[in-house]
Amino acid sequence: ALAVGRVSRLPDGRWELTYYLHNTVTGALTDSAVFTTSGNDVRMCAHRIADRIYTNLTGEGPIFASKLVYVAQLARNRYELVISDSDGGNRQAALQSHEPIISPVWSPDGKKIPYVSFEDRKPIIYVQELATGARHAICAFRGNNSAPAFSADGGTLAVALSRDGLTQIYLMNANGTGLRRFTKSYGIDTEPCFSADGQWVYFTSDRGGAPQIYRQPLAGGPAERVTFGSSYAISPTVSRDGRYLSYISRIDGRFRTAVMDLTTGQNTLVTTTDRDESPSFAPNGRFLVYATEVNGRGVLGTASVDGRLSTRLTGLGDI
């Protein structure tokens, strides 16, 4: 395939981006598009063109026009909740704090971000509106308030709370009402995430000794263990199509990102770094982003679900 493009300035100051994709074997025009935009959106238009090329060549869903949310530590007591393009560019701070911020995640519609802030010297879960910057605390109970995660339909939040003793998984409505306990174990249950079909909640638990990934039906019933190939597994996340589960596996003292095919049960280590954390799938479920440490500095990396492709995002600050 051959991609050809042109960028031109219009008389009204806007930009016009034109692109053509040709089949080099037949010479046929496979795809074309014209984008007209202001200067602020030129790079996003380039990402949309990259998505069209990628989808035409692979048949898979788009990836490049998506957004990242992460926490950067800019100084000893300075933290930022950052929104950026998928390549780390167009970086914007959604929140600044002198206390740690952890566990940011997207709402399914991309309009809200729940996260945990320690600004009041205790962990509190907030939900922030991206359009306005307005936010409200939805979990400020005694003890631990952590690990928020939206259901696929955006109607339910899962959180990890220690309000009744050991940290357990609780569910609530997206507006913070209707809190109810979901797991009941003699261990620590944390890091919940929903399956794509909304039928299961995956989570980390040490109920059997060392931490492992479990899942429990949302409709009720006992939890079942999911991971068996590692003596230590944490931080589950499920792809939007429901095919893959990613998690952090400790192998010979190294914390590496693993991907499980939920249909076959096959596990694949997809990174070569040894301090990975917080994996998250791209919208098309074929790539994921994760945090790791290289030369004593926190960075973001990406990997394909088969481990064949990987890259590192630079210039993002200490993640």
Residue ranges of model-derived segments:
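Amphipathic beta-strand/beta-sheet edge segments enriched in Tyr/Trp
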Residues: 1-48, 52
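Short beta-strand elements that form the blades of beta-propeller/WD-repeat-like
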Residues: 66-71
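A residue-level detector for well-ordered beta-strand positions
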Residues: 20, 82-84, 104, 128, ...
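Sec/Tat-exported extracytoplasmic proteins
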Residues: 11, 25, 57-61, 117, ...
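Conserved beta-propeller blade repeats
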Residues: 41-45, 56, 98-116, 135-136, ...
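Beta-propeller blade-edge and WD-like acidic-aromatic loop motif
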Residues: 77-92, 112, 116-137, 155-156, ...
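Extracytoplasmic
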Residues: 2, 12-17, 63-65, 76-78, ...
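Aromatic (tryptophan-biased) beta-strands that constitute blades/sheets of beta-rich domains
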Residues: 27-35, 92-95, 137, 183, ...
